[in-house]
């Protein structure tokens, strides 16, 4: 609470902070400065650009940040609600929903390593391992408040017609919809990649929305949430879908979670401070081959392949050097003063490099976990590659918590009627 209050008093923001808040590049801000669209101030000591809070208030994203109601919205409800989750992975969504006050009755996951992770950390959870299509959900009919899950984005076969529930058979969304049909929960909560918005020219999402409506639910318009606004030190975006059963929907409005009032950085993730009460613990991590380490040692914090000498650029990029485009993920070293880039299933892939800001090495398993806001005591099972994959695929815990609290508020409204 004290940190939140201090953040509310902040009156000046750096170039990188404003870039993150507004969702534009630092180069775009420099162009706006030159054009007079958003003129920066200059620090007398180092001549660095900064911006006054008053300058940002006309921007919608900044208003969202400055109007934070985080402490009020994250108060724990006295009511106990239940959740059944599909595609649970390593528990990012489950842990966030648990923090929000939702009690798990079943989690389904097909990956054996992820199931071991769930059982290791929460022996009391009912973890059902295996293909979701083989799970019978009818025993849970009318006993579950929330059905949650992040079904993978898959195309449907249209053949020139509007699709119904049965037409999506064979996809993982069908299994989510089948679970909804069998369980009849009060609320549906689904998450997916931002790309679902435009997948198959928008038809995939339109079909999902239509089927949710056909199942007897009132859908609130899906929204892309930026994790950096929800106390997650990572530039990650997720599409969130929320719907309430028709017989409960009359006069009910869903309020999306408001932002935390500060953009947290990689330093907040890995060092003692506002997010964690200690530095990140040591853990296993991938290693670079000798030549790759030599090349990445030349990249400054926040830099990438264009910061290398031209001959080294050509050596590292090979044919990609001549293809043009930014390719800003290649030979990328993270910065302490910015949120991490989106984590992938491995930290040392050439297209999506995630090099430590000071040491020339990939991020470790525990560093990965902190960036996804898992607690240090959350243990991941399996070989190192499986641990990275579980963490990289997870929903950030704090994002799930924020959404979970908003769903709990929705259920509270339903209960009060």
Swiss-Prot record:
Single Gene Ontology MF annotation: DNA (cytosine-5-)-methyltransferase activity
SAM-dependent MTase C5-type domain sequence ranges: 81-414
Biological-process GO terms, alphabetical: DNA restriction-modification system; methylation; negative regulation of gene expression via chromosomal CpG island methylation; regulation of DNA-templated transcription
EC number: 2.1.1.37
Positions of the catalytic residues: 153
Enzyme class: transferase
Annotated family: Belongs to the class I-like SAM-binding methyltransferase superfamily. C5-methyltransferase family.
Name of the protein this chain belongs to: Type II methyltransferase M.Eco47II
Organism: Escherichia coli
């Amino acid at each position: 609470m004290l940190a939140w209050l201090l953040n509310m008093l902040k009156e000046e923001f750096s170039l990188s902070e404003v870039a993150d808040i507004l969702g534009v590049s630092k180069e775009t801000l420099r162009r706006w400065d030159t054009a007079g669209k958003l003129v920066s101030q200059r620090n007398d000591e180092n001549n660095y650009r900064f911006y006054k809070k008053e300058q940002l208030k006309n921007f919608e994203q900044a208003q969202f940040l400055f109007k934070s109601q985080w402490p009020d919205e994250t108060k724990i409800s006295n009511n106990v609600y239940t959740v059944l989750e599909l595609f649970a992975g390593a528990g990012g969504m489950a842990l966030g929903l648990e923090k929000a006050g939702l009690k798990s009755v079943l989690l389904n996951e097909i990956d054996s390593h992820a199931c071991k992770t769930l059982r290791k950390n929460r022996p009391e959870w009912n973890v059902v391992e295996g293909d979701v299509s083989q799970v019978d959900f009818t025993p849970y009919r009318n006993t579950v408040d929330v059905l949650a899950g992040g079904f993978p984005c898959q195309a449907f076969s249209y053949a020139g017609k509007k699709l119904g529930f049965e037409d999506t058979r064979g996809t993982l969304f069908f299994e989510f919809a089948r679970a909804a049909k069998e369980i009849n929960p009060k609320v549906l909560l689904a998450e997916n990649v931002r790309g679902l918005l435009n997948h198959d020219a928008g038809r995939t999402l339109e079909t999902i929305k239509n089927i949710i409506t056909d199942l007897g639910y009132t859908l609130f318009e899906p929204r892309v949430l930026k994790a950096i606004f929800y106390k997650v030190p990572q530039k990650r975006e997720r599409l969130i879908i929320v719907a309430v059963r028709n017989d409960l929907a009359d006069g009910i409005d869903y309020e999306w979670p408001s932002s935390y009032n500060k953009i947290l950085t990689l330093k907040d993730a890995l060092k003692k401070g506002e997010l964690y009460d200690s530095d990140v613990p040591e853990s296993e991590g991938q290693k670079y081959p000798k030549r790759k380490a030599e090349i990445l040692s030349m990249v400054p914090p926040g830099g990438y392949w264009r910061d290398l000498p031209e001959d080294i650029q050509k050596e590292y990029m090979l044919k990609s050097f001549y293809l043009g485009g930014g390719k800003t993920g290649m030979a990328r070293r993270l910065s302490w003063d910015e949120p991490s880039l989106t984590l992938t299933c491995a930290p040392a892939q050439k297209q999506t490099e995630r090099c430590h800001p000071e040491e020339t090495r990939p991020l470790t398993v525990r560093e990965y976990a902190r960036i996804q806001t898992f607690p240090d005591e959350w243990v991941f099972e399996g070989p190192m590659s499986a641990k990275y994959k579980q963490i990289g695929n997870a929903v950030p815990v704090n994002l799930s918590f924020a959404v979970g609290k908003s769903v709990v508020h929705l259920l509270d409204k339903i209960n009060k009627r």
